[in-house]
Amino acid sequence: MRFKRLALLFIVGCAVFCANAVSVAFQIVQHGDSEIRSSSYVIEEGLFDFFFGKGIIISNSPAIASDGVENDASFFEKSRQESWEGGVDYFVELTADFSSSNSTNPDADLLENLSSLSYKVLNVGSGAVLGSGKKIPPASSQFKDKRKGLSDFAFGIADDIYKIIRR
């Protein structure tokens, strides 16, 4: 009986020792407005919900409104450096391009206000790009709940990122 207890203790100890958690950090840089849209926060919330549901430790840097692509690199580099200091495994750069020129309600959380969302997944330690992509949202008229449509779109992006991380 004593041998069984020791064997069980050894197996549990090995399992705990081998267990490790994956951590992901991200930052959303928004183009198209000088103020952060609430849509960016809905996307952020969708990413948090998705990764938390998968058991992944998730953190973010605050969303930033950028006036041009030339500033994006410095924003992302600062956030990636903070992620490295925090011991994060992966960093995701998200760029949300908004265009509300044809929108019926430019201030609302609508998919039609989002032109595209691009992402790049980096290994924080090596700086290597593991994958990237860009998605254009579907027609928002197919969603009865406009906010849910934006959240579902964020879940789709998060799923693509998750597949890159799990390769």
Describe each PLM feature range.
Residues 1-7:
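Bacterial N-terminal signal peptides that target proteins for export
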Residues 24, 92-96, 119:
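Generic structural motif
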Residues 26-93, 128, 132:
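N-terminal segment of the mature soluble domain
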Residues 88-105:
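Charged, amphipathic alpha-helical segments
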Residues 21-25, 41-43, 50-55, 101-103, ...:
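C-terminal/domain-edge helix-coil "capping" segments
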Residues 7-16:
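Bacterial N-terminal signal peptides
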Residues 31-33, 99, 140:
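A short, flexible beta-alpha/helix-coil linker loop
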Residues 11, 84, 109-111:
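Generic marker of residues within folded, mature protein domains
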